[in-house]
Amino acid sequence: MEQERVKKALERFRNHVISQSKRNLTRTQKNSSKKLYNSIKGDLKVHQNSFTLEFSMEDYGVYQDAGVSGVKKKYNTPYSYKSKMPPSKAFDKWITRKGLAPRDSGGKFSKRKSLSFLIARSVYRNGIKPSLFFTKPFEAAYKNLPEELIEEYGLDAIELFNEQIDTILENG
């Protein structure tokens, strides 16, 4: 397969994965700060006898994609909360962006710090449900790669996907 066709096929693959991943983030409402959305990138380098295609995103994107098991609710994921809760401070800006204003039984506003703690405890117990915002477009785009490209370069989808996740975790 000539190099120019390989490059075009891989560019289409990269662009499809990125655009669909961003679309999924927006559709599943996991895009409140736009930080993860804006961080999804793909770097393609085609050489004489090989190519490299690396996807990158914010570290926490891997956990949003694969999910995290809580102490009470389990998901099919390698990640889990065991003994430490996520820091409640991490949810403070999210609460503000979402416009959540908690009230007590008397109708008075309660402290945002209390709500942050309750959300952190809920995430610790119930985990983060896998969204597969990146996994699904990656696998779908892989199926649409030209067969000769897969055969010539010996591409294995699972191995390729696992390498991408490892790269994201290492570079983040």
Each language-model region and where it sits:
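Charge-rich, low-complexity N-terminal segments
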Residues: 1-46, 50-52
